[in-house]
Amino acid sequence: PQGYSYITQIGTGNYNEKTSELYTDYSFITADLGIGEEASNVFQNLAVQKLTETTEKMLVAPLRFKSVLLDEMDRVINAAKLGRPASMILKNNSISDRDIILKLEEASCAGVRIDMIVRGICCVRAEVPGKTENLHIRSLVGRYLEHGRIYSFYDGVTTRIYIASGDFLTRNTECRVEVGVRVEDPVLIQKLSNILQLQLRDNVNAREMRADGSYQKVKAAPGEPLVNGQMDMYDLLRDDWLARDAAPAAEPEQPEIKASERPSEPETRPEPVQVAEQPAEPAKQPATVKATPAPAVQSAPAPHAVDRAERHGHPSLFQRLHDWLRR
């Protein structure tokens, strides 16, 4: 409705007080009107046990989640067929959806570079000749539990990034109500891209899948610096937070007055009018004041001292005490 404003939070996890000490997630808070209206519509549909069928900015499973991601993969595949450097980076917990797996095989055969960071269940083989030779899968297991979902698609021109609550499991894409959103802020896109690249360089907690389905721990080459994706990301976010606290508060911008809005000056200025000087009046003599002696003040009993006995002609207790003290 007109006049309404929304603040919407879309996250890859929840606010569980126990798991929040271990899980790492991503949260997107926005005042975007379109996202707010669509999120409100999702809750209204849930209240009447109805599925959300149409959205413009949000991903909403089971009807508008997988289809959007498959469209993004098709866009990258078409870019690769045109000879552009196309790639995808997909980070989630698990993958088992058959449609997505087949689309990843198609993308790999088209020459798309695919990097996946999958912590748990993974039903697709990496680096299989003729099928997934351009698909590379790694898992990160370290101090924190990787729980975030980030889906990045690059078509050789632009990078489109989504965060979502749902994995690539069939139960998420077809059987649950999951949500996601495309991140359009260039600063946030760069930050998420940096996080993904940092985890792809990890040589402390990472294990990579081989063609036979086994995993091999990634080790740093001789002389290569150690990269701990989790702790380096912690340092990155901490430094960014401290830099924000140390930065001086921005002063409010003053509205710029356009030349057309400024008051125009008159072409001819009026000459000042001369006023004839008036002769000064002689100073008046101060009036003399004679002091008169003040009348003597006699003490009298307070009005409240007159009690009921005095009203009947008898001296009151207060009057008798007053007379005794004056003796």
Please annotate each region the language model reported:
Residues E21, G34-T52:
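Prokaryote-biased recognition of long, low-complexity C-terminal linker/tail segments
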Residues Q49-M58, G83-P85:
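Gly-rich Lys/Arg/Thr-decorated short loops/hinges at beta-loop-alpha junctions or inter-strand turns
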Residues P1-S20, I29-G36, P62-R327:
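PLD/PLD-like phosphodiesterase catalytic module centered on the HKD motif
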